[in-house]
């Protein structure tokens, strides 16, 4: 398993769709991961799962699967591999109530034996690498990531990613980069460290303190699909080019989803661009961009807002 640099774009549900991954890759991310694909939905052939599975025009194509039942995960892994996946990532880190309510994501950390059975079934189902993403544990009284990682490696997992929080922390407080080192000490496969990485200094520090081989960045890329590449050493886009990037991103979503769906999906992305690069935008102007159902009007208003943000010099860092 080889990657072009040590900065990985995290899988983010509702964010890292194919247009976002294409941009992140173009701007220099070392590896990108799909949104979480629900294993049972993929096996049952739902349109949303197929949308999330689609590969962009580069390799490796890394697909993240989530589920509770070993047989669904194994079947979904086979389907993903048959449709171009180069790497399967098992989600044991998602803290969302909807996901843990189905006893998947980080809920699996409460039942390590069950989780290991699921991991073994997935590894045996495919001939491509299988990796694992998880948190430190369910809560501060059950920090079991080192034990699960050690057993997962013995079961054939070829890479482990750790987010430096427990499930009960959700995204509160600060990620514990030092705690990730306990996983580094018990596995020999590559380790990726994740959590609260915003700057190049953060990336250097999390690698130093965790002993990890690579860093994963998620929320820091929202409104900045180029940011993983920048942390890996690529040039920061010029401020006067931000409007072009944002509008291109919007048009890529229109092409991928079709107008009706894209307008809805794009709102969060447009909001992030505006928050970062046009924070002084009047509420009525922002509302006009966010609620318009006319793609040409959205593009024109977005250009105006982001170009004005560049001129007035008040954009957020």
Curated annotation (Swiss-Prot):
Task: Look up keyword Glycoprotein and say if it applies.
Answer: no
Q: Does the keyword Phosphoprotein apply?
A: no
Per its record, how is this protein called by name?
Answer: Probable tRNA-dihydrouridine synthase
Query: Which InterPro entries does this chain map to?
Result: Aldolase_TIM, DUS-like_FMN-bd, DUS_fam, DusB-like, tRNA-dHydroUridine_Synthase_C, tRNA_hU_synthase_CS
The alphabetized UniProt keywords are: Flavoprotein, FMN, NADP, Oxidoreductase, RNA-binding, tRNA processing, tRNA-binding
Gene name per UniProt: dus
Alphabetized NCBIfam families for the sequence: nifR3_yhdG
Q: Which organism is it from?
A: Rhizobium leguminosarum bv. phaseoli
Q: Which residues are the active-site ones? A: 94 (proton donor)
Question: Cross-referenced Gene3D superfamilies, in alphabetical order?
Answer: Aldolase class I, Putative flavin oxidoreducatase, domain 2
Name the protein family.
Answer: Belongs to the Dus family.
PROSITE patterns given in the database record: UPF0034 (PS01136)
* Required cofactor names: FMN
């Amino acid at each position: 398993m080889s990657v072009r640099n040590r900065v990985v774009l995290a899988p983010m549900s509702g964010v890292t769709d194919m247009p976002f991954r294409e941009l992140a890759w173009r701007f220099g991310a070392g590896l990108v991961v799909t949104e979480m694909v629900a294993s049972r939905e993929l096996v049952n052939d739902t349109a949303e799962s197929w949308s999330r599975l689609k590969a962009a025009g580069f390799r490796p194509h890394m697909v993240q699967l989530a589920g509770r039942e070993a047989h669904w995960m194994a079947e979904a892994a086979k389907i993903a591999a048959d449709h171009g996946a180069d790497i399967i990532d098992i989600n044991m880190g998602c803290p969302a109530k909807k996901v843990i309510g189905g006893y998947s994501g980080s809920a699996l950390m409460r039942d390590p034996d069950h989780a290991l059975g699921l991991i073994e079934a997935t590894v045996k189902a495919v001939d491509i690498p299988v990796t694992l993403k998880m948190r430190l544990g369910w809560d501060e009284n059950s920090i079991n990531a080192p034990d699960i990682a050690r057993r997962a490696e013995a079961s054939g997992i070829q890479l482990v990613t750790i987010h430096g929080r427990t499930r009960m922390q959700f995204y509160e407080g600060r990620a514990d980069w030092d705690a990730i080192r306990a996983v580094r000490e018990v596995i020999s496969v590559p380790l990726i460290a994740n959590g609260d990485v915003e700057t190049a200094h953060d990336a250097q520090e999390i690698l130093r303190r965790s002993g990890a081989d690579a860093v994963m960045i998620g929320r820091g890329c929202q409104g900045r699909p180029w940011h993983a590449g920048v942390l890996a050493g690529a040039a920061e886009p010029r401020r006067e080019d931000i409007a072009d990037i944002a509008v291109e991103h919007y048009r890529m979503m229109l092409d991928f989803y079709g107008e009706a769906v894209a307008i809805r999906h794009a709102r969060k992305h447009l909001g992030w661009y505006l928050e970062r690069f046009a924070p002084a935008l009047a509420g009525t102007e922002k509302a006009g961009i966010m609620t318009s159902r006319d793609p040409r009007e959205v593009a024109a208003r977005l250009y105006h807002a982001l170009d004005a943000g560049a001129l007035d010099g008040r954009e957020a860092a």
